[in-house]
Structure formats: structure tokens, C-alpha cells
Amino acid sequence: MGCGLYGMLAFALLTVFMAGLMVGRTPEYIGKKINAFDMKMVCIIILVPPLCLLLATAITTLFPAAQQLQADGGWLSNTGSHGFSEILYAYTSMAGNNGSAFAGFQANTVLTNVMGGTVMLLVRFLPMVAVIYLAQSLASKKYVPAGSGTLATTSPLFVGFLIVIVLIVGALTFLPVLALGPLAEFFTQLHVLG
């Protein structure tokens, strides 16, 4: 069972909240008013997975063995930006409960196993708990009929706004770390080939 449905619902709630802020109205979703508690739960759902995998990547890169080649007793077959990409991909995969890694990363170490297990546990269950609290909060609210200022969640405007919100949150979350790994490697190879 995946977590894509409640992840997308969290982004839909964030979109409704942002739209409500832009027009100065209390945000509503499926006839329920969205309050601060709901937004805290949405933030947990959206931010826990990237924070866990980025924190695990950062902690792993601090260890000297994560900066050395395997021939020198390290965990990487490549150093630099590609080595960083290997570590980032391993934890991204663990956060998605896939468990794959680049062949150049020695993933079967005590640190990687403990960090990976912790990442999998936190990324899977913390958002689930937040979703349960969010569902309880929404279920306990009275239905409010849609007014003239309510953003219809079936409109193309909402879909476009949702896509923009997902792209902005994704870019703000991952663009800095992608600049250190895959993008840096791309531009390095571009410079070498050019």
C-alpha cells in the first residue's frame, strides 16, 4: 500500500490554503474549513519525507568513510559529486521503501543500515499518524456550503495551481541538494567534454 493518495491530498489542502490566503478568505476543502491544526498536519505529511532523507544524506557525508574510495577503505567507488549522488539516491530510495542504490555505494554498513531503517520507519509512519489526526480533525467539522469565493477543486485553475505548488515545494526542497550532486556532475562532464 503506497502513500501517494494521502500525499496528493496533503498537496491539495496546501493548495486550497494558499489560494485562500491569496484572496483573503478562510480556506475550505470539500465543505470543511481548514484551520491551523490541519495545516500543521499537512506540513508534517509533506516535509517529513524530504527532511529525513536529506538529514540522513548529510549525516552520512560527514563520516570519513563516506568521503573515501572503496580501495582506501571507504564506501564509494566515486568521490565528489557522483559519490554524493550515490549517497543521496540510496537514502531517497530507502525513503520510498524501494531499497535500491547505485552500485558504487557500499550500502551494507552499520551506519547505512541503521540510518536507512530509521529513515524508512519515520518516512512511512510519521505521515500516516499525521493523516489520521488530519482525518479526525476534518471529520469533526461541520459542513459549510460553498460560497462565491470558494475555489472549486474540479476546476482547471485549481489543477494548474496544484501543479505549481507541487513544483515549487519540490524545487525548494531538492534543488539545493541536486545542485551539489547530479547537476554539479552534469556541468563538470559538460566542461570536460566541451
Language-model features and meaning:
Residues 50, 157-179:
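Final/C-terminal transmembrane alpha-helix of multipass membrane proteins
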Residues 1-28, 32, 36, 40, ...:
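Membrane-embedded translocation segments of transport machinery
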Residues 43, 115, 159-163:
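Hydrophobic alpha-helical transmembrane segments
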Residues 1-20, 104-138:
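Pore domain of cation channels
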Residues 16, 20, 24-28, 132, ...:
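Short helix-terminus and kink motifs of transmembrane alpha helices
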Residues 1-3, 70-122, 177-194:
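P-loop potassium selectivity filter motif centered on the GYG triad
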Residues 21-35, 133-153:
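Alpha-helical transmembrane segments
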Residues 132-143, 169, 177-179, 183-184:
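Juxtamembrane and boundary regions of transmembrane helices in multi-pass small-molecule transporters
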